[in-house]
Amino acid sequence: MNIVILGTQWGDEGKGKIVDMLTEDVAAVVRFQGGHNAGHTLIIDGEKTILRLIPSGILREGVLCLIGNGVVLSPPALMEEIEELNAKGIPVTERLRISSACNLLLPYHVALDKAREAELGTKAIGTTGRGIGPAYEDKVARRGIRAMDLLHPNQLLEKIKKATAYHNIQLEHYYHQTPLDYQSIYNQLMEFREKIKPMIGDVSALLGNLRRQNKHIIFEGAQGSLLDIDLGTYPYVTSSNTTAGSAATGSGFGPLYFDRVLGITKAYVTRVGAGPFPTELTNEEGKKMAKRGNEFGSVTGRPRRCGWFDVISMRRTIQINSLTGIVLTKLDVLDEFAKIHLCTAYRCDGEVVNEPPFDQSLLESCEPVYEEMPGWQTSTYGLTDYSEMPKEARNYISRLEELLGVPITIISTGPDRKHTIVRQAVFNQVITAKG
């Protein structure tokens, strides 16, 4: 069985924990888009591990970890991550494979990203400044440097020379920044070449072999669906496609080979950086939510904006991803709230709407229409049995399923992989506890 697991909001939904939990049954985990701008936080027996590029299956012995062609790969970031894992006694290089078609993220991408955000000032998009956008620009413009280029040093030198000259024109003459030296960039890549070279290969072919052997494969998304470059809250989005279709194009695996699509969603909503957020709470409730949820970016450390669950945006996410199941995370964050609110419609320019507008100026003006439910005000932290869940919490989950039309198959009640209620087994159709 082949399963896509992705975020349904603006990222930070807890995908890493769920992927890690499910990898006990899989042969491989694939990253198919994004870069090192988002981190997946895993907590195993109290020990925290943050992964940025390497798939979350790396913490499971014997699981093959694949970086697909849809990822933009920073060699220094990758090597740093490998070294961090090795220091914890986790071997990486024997189980990690990088698509030869994967584009590399290089110093001029980072320089451009930072220069652009600085120029925009208060109107900045709110990127992480790690060069993701410029790297994808080079890919689309067909001037990108790919992992396979590391195998041909002479050709690589010429490509680096041309690309650096091109980007230096912008850096020096438009942004008034110091130009970069192509030879330094090339020399740095040569240092990484010998370490990365054994891991470069044909990821699409590997996936095909696993499929023919009827092995289980997980395709792990980064960021969230509302950050999709085409279908998200543009222009306040990331530079890749974060929705389910990208699992195919970003890995070289045919779309008809996917069996399920699981959407990870918090029991509330968070967002980092600028952009519309209809249910955002700027009052004490929002601060309480952020504190209880420890809502700070795992890579950037930036505080996350918090708000109530948005049924309207979630329905859009279900539609664009063809979700077959939902994983509800961080339910325990709501334990102390006397009242829980669900946004069931928007009021835009005096009109009640049930679909999120793609026009961001209109979305900015939308106000949430709430349905109020009683809170449970008792701890759900660490629960593993649905029958032990407070009645009010079960009512909240049932109401979400009713409004969304998709089953909530897994509930996360804490950060550790053990803090989980499995209502429906992922790799078969057996219902273990419906409640």
UniProtKB/Swiss-Prot annotation:
Protein's cellular compartments: Cytoplasm
The keyword Iron is assigned to this record: no
List of residues binding IMP: 12-15, 37-40, 128, 142, 223, 238, 302
GO cellular component: cytoplasm
Superkingdom of the source species: Bacteria
GO molecular function per UniProt: adenylosuccinate synthase activity; GTP binding; magnesium ion binding
Major subcellular site: cytoplasm
Residues annotated as catalytic: 12 (proton acceptor), 40 (proton donor)
SUPFAM superfamilies, per database record: P-loop containing nucleoside triphosphate hydrolases
UniProt-annotated binding residues for substrate: 298-304
Binding positions (GTP): 11-17, 39-41, 304, 330-332, 412-414
Known partners and oligomeric status: Homodimer.
NCBIfam families: PRK01117.1, purA
Name of the protein: Adenylosuccinate synthetase
Taxon lineage: Bacteria, Pseudomonadati, Pseudomonadota, Gammaproteobacteria, Legionellales
